[in-house]
Amino acid sequence: MGTSDYLARMRVEYGSVEKDGSSDLDVDWLGPDPATGWVTLLHQWMAEAEQAGAAEPNAMVVATVDDRGRPVTRTVLCKSVDASGVSFYTNYDSEKGRQLAAAPYASATFPWYLVGRQVHVHGAVTKVSAEETADYWSKRPRGSQLGAWASQQSLPIASRAALMQQLTEVTERFADVEEIPVPPHWGGYLIAAEVVEFWQGRENRVHNRIRVCGGQVERLQP
């Protein structure tokens, strides 16, 4: 079997009102104020993806660009959603941190394959406040805090053993420290919700797409 045939077998037909019981996405799902209604709908869809069995439904694929204008993507975990946008936390010295410093704009996609839905958010990127970072940091498991100190994210390393040695050294360093401080190179980013698009898979690839931009709402052709 050729590769194209193999991939063709993976095709999935999306649902309809009759098939999956979910009504067609429409602009009224955003409520009377789309500028904030998108937040409610995103939370709702995330919860429904979790109920359907999606692993880490807050996972989002974040795209940045490198110094040659080429797109780079990776999956991160969304840690807050409000009218201002969506946030995530990372090492500021990582590849994505360096790229955002040079070109502070990004897009994020929540891909909920189990329920045939996606949400796209894109806009300018800013660092969250030190207070917000400290608050989130304090809620992280101690092991995750140690990992953030141990890893020089995105830099090459000789082996797994070398990485674990760095973790051991950091663990010993903070052995008698009850509250591990936030690393100076670590914190959050907020992707502003300049544009938000909701996508719902439908039969025959005639999907539903609703876009919110600057408080304006429009339906897009699939």
Swiss-Prot record:
What residues does FMN bind to? Answer: R74, T75, V76, L77, C78, K79, Y89, T90, K96, Q118, Q153, S154, W199, R209
Q: How does it assemble?
A: Homodimer.
Briefly state the protein's biological role.
Catalyzes the oxidation of either pyridoxine 5'-phosphate (PNP) or pyridoxamine 5'-phosphate (PMP) into pyridoxal 5'-phosphate (PLP).
Q: Which reaction does it catalyse?
A: pyridoxamine 5'-phosphate + O2 + H2O = pyridoxal 5'-phosphate + H2O2 + NH4(+); pyridoxine 5'-phosphate + O2 = pyridoxal 5'-phosphate + H2O2
Which keywords are on file for this protein?
Flavoprotein, FMN, Oxidoreductase, Pyridoxine biosynthesis
Naturally occurring in which organism (per UniProt): Mycolicibacterium vanbaalenii (strain DSM 7251 / JCM 13017 / BCRC 16820 / KCTC 9966 / NRRL B-24157 / PYR-1) (Mycobacterium vanbaalenii)
What note does UniProt attach to the cofactor annotation?
Binds 1 FMN per subunit.
Name of the coding gene: pdxH
GO molecular function annotations of the record: FMN binding; pyridoxamine phosphate oxidase activity
What lineage is this protein's organism placed in?
Bacteria, Bacillati, Actinomycetota, Actinomycetes, Mycobacteriales
Designated name of the protein: Pyridoxine/pyridoxamine 5'-phosphate oxidase
